[in-house]
Every structure is written in C-alpha cells, then in structure tokens.
C-alpha cells in the first residue's frame, strides 16, 4: 500500500512539474514581450493561456527526422534521459504527499546534476554536427566548472545544519532566513544556478552567432520539445532549491510558492536584460572568484562548528 501511495505521489509530482513548465514558458514569453514593449502571446483562448499546450501538440505531431551518419540510439535516448533526470531530481524535495523521504537529499541532487552533463555531451556528439559538438563541449566545460563551487556551497550548509536532508533547512530558518545572514552566498548561488541551467548571461551552449543553436541544433519536433522541457524543469527546480536553502523552506506554506515564482521570474528577467558574457570571463569567474569564495565559506563553517563543539 505504501508503495502504491508513493507511486501516485510521484505521478502527481511529475504531472504538476510538467504543467508548471508549460506555464513557465508562457510567463517567459509574456515577460520578454513586456520588456521589449510589445504584447506576449494573447490570441489563443483567454489571454493566450492555452498557448504552451498548443505548442506542445504542434511539436509532438511534427515529423521526427534524424541526421545522416548520426548515432541513432544515443541521439534519441539523450533528450529522454535528460527530461527523466530533470523530473527525477525533484524526489529529494520535502513534500507533503507520500514521497520518498531522503536523508541524503543533497547528495542525490549533486548526483543528478552531475549526470545531466552526460546527456548534453552525448546529444552534441551523436548529432554528427560540428556546431552541436562544440555547443555540447562548451556546456560540459561550463557545467563542470560551476558544479565545483555549487557542491562546495552545499557542503558548507551540510556542515552548518549537520545533515543532507532538505527538511533540516526548515528547522534552521524558523527565526531568520539564511538569505539575510549569508546574502553574498545567496547571490553566488543564484549566479551558479544561471550557469548550471545554461541561461543568459551564460548561454554559451547555444550562442546563435557562433553555434546556430548549440548542442540541440539537429533536434526537431519531439526531441527538441523534450530538451526544452528538461531545461525549464531544471530552472523551476533550481528556483525551488534556492527557496529551500535561503528563503525559509516552509514548503507547506502558500507564500513559499510566491517566492518560487519570484525566483523563476528573476531567471526570465536576466534573460531579457543581460547581454551574453565572454567565455574566458565565464571560466575566470568560476575558477578564480567563485571557487575561492566557496572554499573560504566552507572553511568558515567548519571553523564555526569546531568552535561551537569546543564551547559545548
């Protein structure tokens, strides 16, 4: 019975995430429209609300082609695996429904994000296109560079709260949010989240002027839709993780989802306003600035815990 309840909870979660992804794309198009002083999609149905569902139907009913001399199996499997990982990583979040409660939620998140690199790399390589391969290589180098700082910041919090379980963030933020105490850390985490999800200003994987569309250049119809959905699901997840770590983790509160929407809006806002970074500056930022920053914070938290234990 417990297994059936977990299965139903997982299915509900997946459906809710996919519907959220649909409306996040609509929000992005609306916000970008207003940033560029025009209307977003507003013709389909009431104020353009069914637009993302129409786009999904259009994409999945188009002809699925595959490039000549491409690696057929890995070419098709990588978008599916990419979406699967983006949905699977949601399991580590503390939810009210009967889901798997992980004591090692933070570690599970790191494993899933590390595996996400391979899907991009395989998608780029198996397309048999120079543009796709270069885009894939860029995305892999970028993700690996920023994952180091991401893991170190998460490890700092693990030392602070003494557990990998996400629920502990709620206990430690009852009186004051970590955002207020550790504001520089929150800014760095948000920047790393932008880089991890390959979003503006770090969208080198799909630099139009250089790589046409990056690692997904050869994908059409369903394959492209799956990659697109995986990207937006990871944006939502990163927004939720930011709210859990820095904004109180009160997941049973309606205000939590208002905060989640605001952080997702920041991702879109960055896309509408910021220009693309230079690639060497991106790598400089990752290895010279963020790595030293996260290592310093890690040492600070370890020292803080040692001091605390010595006083006790």
From Swiss-Prot:
GO BP terms in the entry: aerobic respiration
One cellular-component annotation, GO: mitochondrial inner membrane
Pfam families per UniProt: NADHdh
InterPro entries in UniProt: NADH_UbQ_OxRdtase_su1/FPO, NADH_UbQ_OxRdtase_su1_CS
Membrane spanning stretches: 3-23, 77-97, 104-124, 150-170, 174-194, 226-246, 250-270, 289-309
Protein location: Mitochondrion inner membrane
Top-level lineage group: Eukaryota
Keywords: Electron transport, Membrane, Mitochondrion, Mitochondrion inner membrane, NAD, Respiratory chain, Translocase, Transmembrane, Transmembrane helix, Transport, Ubiquinone
PROSITE patterns in the record: COMPLEX1_ND1_1, COMPLEX1_ND1_2
Disulfide bonds: none
EC numbers, comma separated: 7.1.1.2
Catalysed reactions listed for this entry: a ubiquinone + NADH + 5 H(+)(in) = a ubiquinol + NAD(+) + 4 H(+)(out)
Function: Core subunit of the mitochondrial membrane respiratory chain NADH dehydrogenase (Complex I) that is believed to belong to the minimal assembly required for catalysis. Complex I functions in the transfer of electrons from NADH to the respiratory chain. The immediate electron acceptor for the enzyme is believed to be ubiquinone.
Family to which this protein belongs: Belongs to the complex I subunit 1 family.
Name under which the protein is recorded: NADH-ubiquinone oxidoreductase chain 1
């Amino acid at each position: 019975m417990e297994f059936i309840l977990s299965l139903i909870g997982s299915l509900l979660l997946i459906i809710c995430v996919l519907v959220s992804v649909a409306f996040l794309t609509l929000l992005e198009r609306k916000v970008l429209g207003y940033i560029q002083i025009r209307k977003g999609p507003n013709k389909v149905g009431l104020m353009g609300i069914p637009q993302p569902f129409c786009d999904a139907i259009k994409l999945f009913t188009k002809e699925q082609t595959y490039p000549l001399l491409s690696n057929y199996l890995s070419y098709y499997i990588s978008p599916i695996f990419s979406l699967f990982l983006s949905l699977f990583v949601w399991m580590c979040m503390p939810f009210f429904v009967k889901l798997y409660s992980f004591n090692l939620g933070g570690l599970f998140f790191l494993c899933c994000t590390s595996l996400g690199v391979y899907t991009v790399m395989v998608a780029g390589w198996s397309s048999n296109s120079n543009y796709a391969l270069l885009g894939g290589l860029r995305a892999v180098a970028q993700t690996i560079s920023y994952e180091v700082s991401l893991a170190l910041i998460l490890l700092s919090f693990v030392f602070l709260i003494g557990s990998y379980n996400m629920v502990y963030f709620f206990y430690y933020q009852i009186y004051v949010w970590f955002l207020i105490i550790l504001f520089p850390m929150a800014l760095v985490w948000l920047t790393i989240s932008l880089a991890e999800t390959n979003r503006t200003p770090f969208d080198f994987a799909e630099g139009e002027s250089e790589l046409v569309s990056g690692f997904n250049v050869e994908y059409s119809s369903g394959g492209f839709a799956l990659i697109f959905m995986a990207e937006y699901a990871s944006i939502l997840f990163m927004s939720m993780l930011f709210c859990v770590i820095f904004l109180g983790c009160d997941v049973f509160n309606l205000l939590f989802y208002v905060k989640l929407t605001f952080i997702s809006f920041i991702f879109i806002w960055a896309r509408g306003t910021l220009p693309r970074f230079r690639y060497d500056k991106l790598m400089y930022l990752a290895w010279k600035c963020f790595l030293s920053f996260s290592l310093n914070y890690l040492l600070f938290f370890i020292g803080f815990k040692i001091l605390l234990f010595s006083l006790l």
